[in-house]
Amino acid sequence: MLRTAIRNNVQVSQKRTYIMSTIASTFLGSILFSKNNQLASKMENGELHMPKDPTLSYLNNNNSNNQAEPYFKRREPDYPGHVPLYNYEKFLMFLGSSIGSFFHPEENKYIVALGESTAIEPILKKLQKTMLSDEIGRQILKEKPRITSTSLNLDYLRSLPDNTIGKNYINWLDKEGVSPDTRVQVKYIDNEELSYIFQRYRECHDFYHAITGLPIIIEGEISVKVFEFMNIGIPMTGLGALFAPLRLKSSQRKRLREIYYPWAIKNGIYSKPLINVYWEKILEQDVDEFRKQMGIETPPDLRNMRKEYFARKKLEKQGKL
């Protein structure tokens, strides 16, 4: 009897153990199965180890065709003809135009690109502030005049008295064989008003030549660039003053160093801001009176100095000096 009882107790204990283990296995299995179902669902939905990108969700919700926007997209232009550039594009344009301007200064495309790639926003905003602080400067920014052969009426300028600004300007254009229509439209500078300020500087450049009497030969251009840099502050003009003389002869560098650089630095610093001159409205004014008002002295005649230099060199070769 005792053995039978013991045997029965063992069987009951084994059943209980089996039942408990079965219940535990079933419970754990259901949990694991539920987890597996959740993992499978996440894998199917692409959520496992790859959380949904909120950017992609936004694009999917807002793009009916489920097509993502291109990663690089050029922004909308600020004004007609504007070409927005990334900073690295501006830097590459600066490098290319710098090299091109140094080896081929006669190529206007390099000068144009160098000017716009170096016309950084802080400099243009400073010019903008200069113009906004002056009554005439504000008028220029408001009216945005353009300097062309049509707007100036070159035939009318030829009819003006000899010592007027207009006659002085047209005489210089005719003598140098240039036209106000050759100034390229600005397109790489952001902000419409800042682009106009640079355009205004570009179109007024020939007036600076005319009132100083400096020709468009390399020494004359460098001298005007220094004058502009000291007065207006356009970076390209300063770069031209630094690097352009490296390609000149020693006699040319000597003239610049001893005569034209000192003149340009002094007059550029002490004269009134040229960017605030409304040239179109003072064409009938006496040019000498204008120079006096602005604080500009005329430099020595560069062409005559070159003629005298070459005449002297010729006499030296002939042994007459």
Swiss-Prot record:
It catalyses: a 4-hydroxy-3-methoxy-5-(all-trans-polyprenyl)benzoate + H(+) = a 2-methoxy-6-(all-trans-polyprenyl)phenol + CO2. GO terms for biological process: ubiquinone biosynthetic process. It is an enzyme of class 4 (lyase). It is a peripheral membrane protein. Keywords: Lyase, Membrane, Metal-binding, Mitochondrion, Mitochondrion inner membrane, Ubiquinone biosynthesis, Zinc. Its EC number is 4.1.1.130. GO terms for cellular component: extrinsic component of mitochondrial inner membrane. Zn(2+) binds at residues 205-206, 209, 221. It is found in: Mitochondrion inner membrane. Pfam families: Coq4. Pathway: Cofactor biosynthesis; ubiquinone biosynthesis. Component of a multi-subunit COQ enzyme complex, composed of at least COQ3, COQ4, COQ5, COQ6, COQ7 and COQ9. PANTHER family: UBIQUINONE BIOSYNTHESIS PROTEIN, UBIQUINONE BIOSYNTHESIS PROTEIN COQ4 HOMOLOG, MITOCHONDRIAL. HAMAP family: Coq4. Lyase that catalyzes the C1-decarboxylation of 4-hydroxy-3-methoxy-5-(all-trans-polyprenyl)benzoic acid into 2-methoxy-6-(all-trans-polyprenyl)phenol during ubiquinone biosynthesis. Belongs to the COQ4 family. This is Ubiquinone biosynthesis protein COQ4, mitochondrial. It comes from Candida tropicalis (strain ATCC MYA-3404 / T1).
